[in-house]
Every structure is written in structure tokens, then in C-alpha cells.
A protein has these predicted regions:
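Helix-start/capping segments and mature chain N-termini
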Residues: 1-101, 105, 127, 134-234, ...
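Charged, gly/pro-rich active-site loop segments
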Residues: 95-97, 105-119
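Extended, Lys/Arg-enriched charged tracts that mediate electrostatic binding to polyanionic substrates
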Residues: 115-129
């Protein structure tokens, strides 16, 4: 295994030594196995290629302050992948198989778990693909489950900072009752045109609901969080603060967002999931995107070019989002007690 400079490791793919694979044929899953071969022998008419029959996940393992490794909420990822599989008429990966594959990937790549204090983590990309050859439209009956581990650098190489977002009304990431609630590649591919256009402007992209283009759906590939206060924007007590996040059948239920909502309630905040009109940003003191990659990505402003409107939230991350960010990171790195049972500790 090549030497890795953890201090300069970026947020990108790094080749692991082993990946884990399992196959589904004749109605049953094989045993998972480790392999150094990173290439698939795949028929050109496989349903994953012809019709996009695939789903994936993303989760992390952290080297804690005590030197132990913690895997964060992998069971929730297993359950979400099962829902995605059912949504695309694929054989769900049993939770037990999912967990075994994650642990095998970790055991076979222990030297890829970054040291504590680097901000880097070991990322796992579980992937489920349809492999049955088909030309006629229809689902496959054979599937491959793969876990790809890769060490990744911190989302914020320096200081926890803000990002600017721009509103997009011309591209719909997912339909209200389509695949938006599942973690499938087509949702992300559908957003590339809009997100790349935003990146060329130095921004990221907010998607609105596909039906009316009125309500906030997602921030690029992440859930949206808004913080509302009943009086002065940044000076108030917690019982006067509301944590807002969209409720929609077109967005992916974020495990990070679910964790943050739990922590927000413990802080005494009111937590609300509902449809959020874009104009309600005017009433928010803080806003952010949230997900596995970044945990929380604070927003300094949202630009609505069509309405010639800019919503400002401050050039620095707000106090509520900052507290939530550090509280969750402290749990993941073992700096505070995990009272929720979110992490599974491995003494390595």
C-alpha cells in the first residue's frame, strides 16, 4: 500500500487495497468476499447500464480521540439501501450481509483509516447494480453488491466556512413521487447540468419542487436546514429557535439530518419538517446544507437571479449550526458520550 500524506489528503477517491463483493442469483445472495480486482466483468446489456437499475450509499468510519475506530449509523444506511432497492425493483441487500461487508472492508483496509486529528475519515461506498442482460424494458433478476472503501480528506480543509447558493428553476432533480426519495445514480446525474453551471459561478445549487418551483427541495445533493428565531436574528434563547427542514417525497431522507434533528431537540430547539417556500428564507437567521460528506455546510447567501433577490445569513457560520456541527463531530470522534448508540466501536 502506498504511503498517504494525511495532511494533504483531499476529498476525492483514493484506491483501496481490497473491495468487497457479493452476488445475487437464483433468488439468493452469495457469501461476501474480498478482492483486489477493482474491475467488473459486466455484460453490455446489464440493466444497470441500459436502464439505470442501481442504488448506492455512503457512510464513514472515524479514528477517535481514544484511538478506537467508530462506524457511524451503518444500520440506517443498510435500511435506506433496502428501500432504494425496493423502489427500483431490485433484491434488497440483507442488513446482516450489508454489515458483514462493511466490517470486511474495514478489516481488509485497516491501514487506510486516517489518524485522529487529521480530519480525514475512511469512507465506504456500498453499491448495488442490476447485472441481468436485457434489451426489452424491464428489471433484472441478478445483482451485484460491492463495498468500495476510500480514505477521504476533510470537506473543509481549513476553517469551517460558508458557501453561496444560487436558486435553479430550470432543472428538476427528481419528480414528487419518483426516485428522489431513493439514493440512486440517476438523481445525481439529473442534477449535474445545474450544479456544474452553479460551480462555474462560484456557487452551489438549490433545487425547488418540480411541480410548482416554489418550495425548497434540496441543496445540490444534500438536505436543507433553516434556523428561524422569534426575535433578533442571532440573540435569543433556544426555546425561541426553530430548526426547519423540507418535507417532500422528492428528497432523500438524510441520516445526517435525522441525527442533527435529534441533537437540535436535545438543545431545546423546536424541530419542524414541512414544505418551505423559498421566500421564507427572509425570516431565517442561519441556513445550511447537510449530509454525510460535510455534516453541515453553512450558507452565507442564496441568490435568486430570476427575482433579483439575495437572502443573506452572515459571512460566518451561525452559532446554532456551529454548535450542532461540533456536537455531532464530537460523537463521531468519541470526544463525548454517544448516548444514542449511533456509533459501533472497534478496538483497533
Amino acid at each position: 500500500m502506498k504511503n498517504i500524506d494525511w495532511s494533504t489528503l483531499g476529498f476525492h477517491y483514493t484506491e483501496p487495497e481490497y473491495i468487497i463483493r457479493a452476488a445475487y442469483h437464483d433468488g439468493k445472495w452469495s457469501e461476501p468476499y474480498a478482492t483486489k480486482d477493482k474491475f467488473l466483468q459486466l455484460h453490455v446489456s446489464a440493466t444497470c447500464l441500459q436502464y439505470g437499475q442501481e442504488a448506492f450509499e455512503g457512510l464513514k468510519a472515524f479514528r477517535g480521540i481514544d484511538g478506537k475506530i467508530r462506524i457511524f449509523r451503518w444500520r440506517e444506511n443498510a435500511r435506506r439501501m433496502a428501500r432504494s432497492a425496493e423502489g427500483l425493483f431490485m433484491a434488497p441487500v440483507p442488513e446482516e450481509l450489508f454489515g458483514r461487508a462493511i466490517y470486511m472492508a474495514l478489516e481488509k483496509n485497516l491501514d487506510l483509516v486516517p489518524p485522529y486529528g487529521t480530519g480525514a475519515t475512511l469512507y465506504f461506498r456500498p453499491l448495488l447494480i442490476g447485472t441481468t442482460p436485457r434489451l426489452g424494458v424491464g428489471p433484472g433478476r441478478d445483482f451485484e453488491f460491492i463495498v468500495i472503501p476510500s480514505p477521504i480528506g476533510p470537506y473543509y480543509p481549513g476553517k469551517f466556512h460558508c458557501t453561496t447558493f444560487i436558486v435553479n428553476r430550470y432543472v428538476d432533480r427528481a419528480a414528487p413521487h419518483g426516485t428522489g426519495q431513493f439514493k440512486v445514480g440517476g438523481n445525481y446525474a439529473a442534477s449535474f447540468r445545474a450544479t456544474e453551471a452553479a460551480h462555474m459561478m462560484g456557487c452551489d445549487c438549490i433545487f425547488l419542487d418540480a411541480k410548482q418551483h416554489k418550495f425548497i427541495d434540496e441543496c445540490s445533493a444534500a438536505n436543507f436546514i433553516g434556523i428561524k428565531r422569534t426575535n433578533d436574528k442571532r440573540q435569543t434563547t433556544n426555546d425561541e429557535i426553530e430548526y426547519l427542514t423540507p418535507k417532500s417525497t422528492a428528497i432523500l431522507p438524510s441520516i445526517t439530518n435525522d441525527s442533527l434533528m435529534t441533537l437540535a431537540r436535545e438543545m431545546g430547539l423546536k424541530v419542524t419538517r414541512r414544505r418551505i417556500p423559498l421566500e421564507e428564507l427572509e425570516q431565517m437567521s442561519e441556513a445550511a446544507a447537510c449530509g454525510t460528506a460535510c455534516v453541515i455546510s453553512p450558507i452565507d447567501k442564496v441568490i435568486d437571479t430570476e427575482k433579483d433577490k439575495v437572502y443573506h445569513f452572515g459571512e460566518q457560520p451561525g452559532p446554532v449550526l456551529t454548535q450542532l456541527y461540533h456536537t455531532l463531530k464530537d460523537i463521531q470522534y468519541g470526544r463525548t458520550e454517544d448516548t444514542h448508540g449511533w456509533t459501533e466501536v472497534i478496538c483497533r
